[in-house]
Protein backbone atom coordinates (compact mmCIF):
# COMPACT_ATOMS: atom_id res chain seq x y z
CA UNK A 1 0.00 0.00 0.00
CA UNK A 2 2.84 2.35 0.82
CA UNK A 3 4.43 1.49 -2.50
CA UNK A 4 1.22 2.32 -4.29
CA UNK A 5 0.93 5.61 -2.42
CA UNK A 6 4.50 6.59 -3.29
CA UNK A 7 3.93 5.65 -6.83
CA UNK A 8 0.78 7.75 -6.89
CA UNK A 9 2.61 10.71 -5.29
CA UNK A 10 5.51 10.31 -7.69
CA UNK A 11 3.10 10.29 -10.59
CA UNK A 12 1.43 13.47 -9.37
CA UNK A 13 4.79 15.20 -8.87
CA UNK A 14 5.97 14.05 -12.30
CA UNK A 15 2.83 15.42 -13.90
CA UNK A 16 3.28 18.77 -12.19
CA UNK A 17 6.96 19.00 -13.20
CA UNK A 18 6.14 18.02 -16.77
CA UNK A 19 3.52 20.76 -16.84
CA UNK A 20 6.01 23.24 -15.38
CA UNK A 21 8.72 22.41 -17.92
CA UNK A 22 6.65 23.17 -21.03
CA UNK A 23 5.58 26.47 -19.49
CA UNK A 24 9.19 27.35 -18.72
CA UNK A 25 10.24 26.23 -22.17
CA UNK A 26 7.52 28.37 -23.74
CA UNK A 27 8.64 31.34 -21.66
CA UNK A 28 12.25 30.87 -22.79
CA UNK A 29 11.12 30.59 -26.42
CA UNK A 30 9.02 33.74 -26.08
CA UNK A 31 11.87 35.66 -24.42
CA UNK A 32 14.29 34.56 -27.13
CA UNK A 33 11.85 35.52 -29.87
CA UNK A 34 11.22 38.94 -28.32
CA UNK A 35 14.96 39.54 -27.90
CA UNK A 36 15.79 38.50 -31.46
CA UNK A 37 12.82 40.37 -32.92
CA UNK A 38 13.62 43.49 -30.93
CA UNK A 39 17.26 43.41 -32.01
CA UNK A 40 16.28 43.04 -35.66
CA UNK A 41 13.74 45.84 -35.29
CA UNK A 42 16.41 48.15 -33.85
CA UNK A 43 18.80 47.26 -36.69
CA UNK A 44 16.04 47.90 -39.21
CA UNK A 45 15.36 51.31 -37.69
CA UNK A 46 19.06 52.21 -37.74
CA UNK A 47 19.30 51.17 -41.38
CA UNK A 48 16.28 53.29 -42.27
CA UNK A 49 17.70 56.28 -40.40
CA UNK A 50 21.08 55.87 -42.13
CA UNK A 51 19.39 55.66 -45.52
CA UNK A 52 17.36 58.81 -44.90
CA UNK A 53 20.46 60.71 -43.73
CA UNK A 54 22.48 59.51 -46.74
CA UNK A 55 19.72 60.56 -49.15
CA UNK A 56 19.45 63.94 -47.44
CA UNK A 57 23.17 64.53 -47.90
CA UNK A 58 23.45 63.00 -51.39
CA UNK A 59 20.39 64.58 -53.04
CA UNK A 60 21.82 68.10 -53.40
CA UNK A 61 25.08 66.66 -54.72
CA UNK A 62 23.22 64.52 -57.25
CA UNK A 63 21.17 67.51 -58.41
CA UNK A 64 24.28 69.66 -58.80
CA UNK A 65 26.35 67.02 -60.59
CA UNK A 66 23.57 65.31 -62.59
CA UNK A 67 24.47 66.99 -65.92
CA UNK A 68 27.86 65.31 -65.62
CA UNK A 69 26.88 62.09 -63.86
CA UNK A 70 24.05 60.96 -66.15
CA UNK A 71 26.13 60.96 -69.36
CA UNK A 72 29.04 59.41 -67.47
CA UNK A 73 26.83 56.60 -66.16
CA UNK A 74 25.37 56.00 -69.63
CA UNK A 75 28.86 55.94 -71.15
CA UNK A 76 30.19 53.54 -68.54
CA UNK A 77 27.13 51.30 -68.97
CA UNK A 78 27.64 51.20 -72.74
CA UNK A 79 31.34 50.44 -72.36
CA UNK A 80 30.64 47.62 -69.91
CA UNK A 81 27.92 46.25 -72.18
CA UNK A 82 30.30 46.35 -75.14
CA UNK A 83 33.04 44.51 -73.27
CA UNK A 84 30.59 41.87 -72.02
CA UNK A 85 29.13 41.38 -75.51
CA UNK A 86 32.61 41.16 -77.03
CA UNK A 87 33.66 38.58 -74.47
CA UNK A 88 30.47 36.60 -74.99
CA UNK A 89 30.90 36.58 -78.76
CA UNK A 90 34.55 35.57 -78.35
CA UNK A 91 33.62 32.68 -76.09
CA UNK A 92 30.91 31.61 -78.56
CA UNK A 93 33.42 31.69 -81.43
CA UNK A 94 36.01 29.71 -79.49
CA UNK A 95 33.35 27.16 -78.55
CA UNK A 96 32.21 26.85 -82.17
CA UNK A 97 35.78 26.43 -83.47
CA UNK A 98 36.55 23.93 -80.74
CA UNK A 99 33.46 21.89 -81.58
CA UNK A 100 34.28 22.06 -85.29
CA UNK A 101 37.87 20.92 -84.70
CA UNK A 102 36.78 18.05 -82.46
CA UNK A 103 34.12 17.03 -84.95
CA UNK A 104 36.53 17.13 -87.90
CA UNK A 105 39.28 15.18 -86.15
CA UNK A 106 37.23 13.00 -83.83
CA UNK A 107 34.43 10.50 -84.18
CA UNK A 108 32.42 12.68 -86.56
CA UNK A 109 35.22 13.01 -89.12
CA UNK A 110 34.19 9.84 -90.97
CA UNK A 111 30.69 11.25 -91.41
CA UNK A 112 32.13 14.45 -92.85
CA UNK A 113 34.38 12.45 -95.17
CA UNK A 114 31.40 10.40 -96.37
CA UNK A 115 29.40 13.58 -96.96
CA UNK A 116 32.33 15.10 -98.87
CA UNK A 117 32.57 12.00 -101.05
CA UNK A 118 28.82 12.08 -101.77
CA UNK A 119 28.97 15.75 -102.70
CA UNK A 120 32.00 15.06 -104.90
CA UNK A 121 30.25 12.20 -106.67
CA UNK A 122 27.17 14.39 -107.22
CA UNK A 123 29.37 17.08 -108.71
CA UNK A 124 30.98 14.50 -111.02
CA UNK A 125 27.54 13.19 -112.00
CA UNK A 126 26.39 16.73 -112.73
CA UNK A 127 29.49 17.45 -114.84
CA UNK A 128 29.07 14.16 -116.70
CA UNK A 129 25.39 14.87 -117.22
CA UNK A 130 26.12 18.34 -118.56
CA UNK A 131 28.80 16.94 -120.84
CA UNK A 132 26.40 14.31 -122.17
CA UNK A 133 23.71 16.94 -122.73
CA UNK A 134 26.24 19.09 -124.60
CA UNK A 135 27.35 16.16 -126.73
CA UNK A 136 23.76 15.20 -127.48
CA UNK A 137 22.95 18.81 -128.33
CA UNK A 138 25.90 18.97 -130.75
CA UNK A 139 24.86 15.70 -132.36
CA UNK A 140 21.32 16.94 -132.86
CA UNK A 141 22.47 20.16 -134.47
UniProtKB/Swiss-Prot annotation:
It is found in: Lipid droplet; Membrane. GO terms for cellular component: membrane; monolayer-surrounded lipid storage body. Residues 30-141 are annotated as: Hydrophobic. Residues 1-24 are annotated as: Disordered. Residues 1-29 are annotated as: Polar. InterPro entries: Oleosin. This is Oleosin 14.9 kDa. It comes from Arabidopsis thaliana. The lineage of its organism: Eukaryota, Viridiplantae, Streptophyta, Embryophyta, Tracheophyta. The gene is OL3.
